[in-house]
Structure formats: structure tokens, C-alpha cells
């Protein structure tokens, strides 16, 4: 049996699903348990509750995570991982000068994710195009890469204004960007 998990808020990067339905690239998507399928839409309203971080090492060959750190809230915390190390072996940028090319390549599979738990509300569509209303639906928004700092800065600005995260409703939108052949949102 599978363990129930919190649906993830993601940005859709697939042009179509397994049934050939066209999907809106760059839209947010969640798996909605009541609908039994993914719902796509943007912009969305997001109410954050908790923000934390976690290191994970992913193997493309095994299509699985090889290790995960504890979930931590502060950079001063020591993120011990599931294989007995720290940060899943991720070496801080300032310490990478002496790494070999292979060691640097290995670092790409190890990432720090910002985990933001909250609720989403939006008017979306199913893959087949049916309208679907999502209201105050609990999700995990896991961000890394170019999203990591902007999301962190937005959440930090809430606390700097002496507001509680769960009293704030953020409007989230995506923006298409390109770097060479890579397209990201």
C-alpha cells in the first residue's frame, strides 16, 4: 500500500499527457484527490504556512532519490542526511575550487530545496479542458534553482513586515525564460 502524501504544487513542463491531451506549459498544476487528476491554472492564490529546506540527491539512472537530509529551517542547522552524511554530500560553493570535473558533475544531482507548505486557490482546468475550481487546497510547493531565492525573499519580506505568513495571500504567476536551449519558469 502507498502512504498518503500532500499533493505537490508544480509548474507544468509537459506539452501533453499520456492520453494526448494538450497541457498548458508554464501553468501551475496540482493533483487534486477529489477530481482524481491534475488541475492546471494560473495565476493562483497561495497562502503559505511553513517554510523549510531539505537537501536531496537524485539518481536519473534509478529514477529515485538516493538520500535526503532532515528538514531544516535555518542555515545554522546541520542538515544530517539518510546515508549518515551532511547535505547529501553537497559541497558549499565556496569550497568547490579544488573539486575535480567528475566531482563537480556529481554535485549537480544534489540540490537544496525550499519546502513551502500552504494552500492554493485558483480556477483551473483538467487535462481534457473541463473547468475545475480549487479552493483552499493543501499543498507542498518544492522549489529549487532559479525559484529558490525569489521565493525565499518573498517569504522573508513577510516576516520583515512583522506579518504572519498564514495571514498573507500571495498571487503566483510564471514567466518563461531561456538560457541557451534551456527553458524554465
Task: Please name every model-derived segment.
Residues 112-184:
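Extended serine/threonine-enriched, polar tracts that run as long, contiguous segments within proteins
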Amino acid at each position: 500500500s502507498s502512504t498518503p502524501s500532500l499533493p505537490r504544487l508544480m509548474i507544468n513542463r509537459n506539452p501533453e499527457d499520456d492520453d494526448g491531451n494538450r497541457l498548458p506549459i508554464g501553468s501551475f498544476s496540482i493533483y487534486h484527490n477529489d477530481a482524481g487528476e491534475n488541475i492546471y491554472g494560473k495565476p493562483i492564490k497561495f497562502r503559505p504556512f511553513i517554510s523549510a529546506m531539505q537537501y536531496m540527491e537524485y539518481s536519473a539512472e534509478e529514477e529515485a532519490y538516493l538520500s535526503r537530509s532532515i528538514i531544516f529551517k535555518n542555515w545554522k542547522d546541520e542538515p544530517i542526511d539518510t546515508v549518515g552524511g551532511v547535505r547529501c554530500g553537497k559541497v558549499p560553493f565556496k569550497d568547490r575550487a579544488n573539486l575535480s570535473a567528475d566531482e563537480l558533475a556529481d554535485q549537480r544531482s544534489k540540490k537544496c530545496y525550499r519546502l513551502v507548505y500552504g494552500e492554493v486557490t485558483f480556477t483551473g482546468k483538467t487535462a481534457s479542458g473541463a473547468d475545475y475550481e480549487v479552493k483552499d487546497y493543501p499543498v507542498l510547493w518544492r522549489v529549487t534553482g532559479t525559484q529558490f531565492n525569489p521565493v525565499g525573499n518573498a517569504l522573508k519580506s513577510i516576516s520583515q513586515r512583522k506579518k504572519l505568513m498564514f495571514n498573507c495571500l500571495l498571487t503566483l504567476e510564471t514567466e518563461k525564460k531561456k538560457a541557451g536551449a534551456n527553458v524554465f519558469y
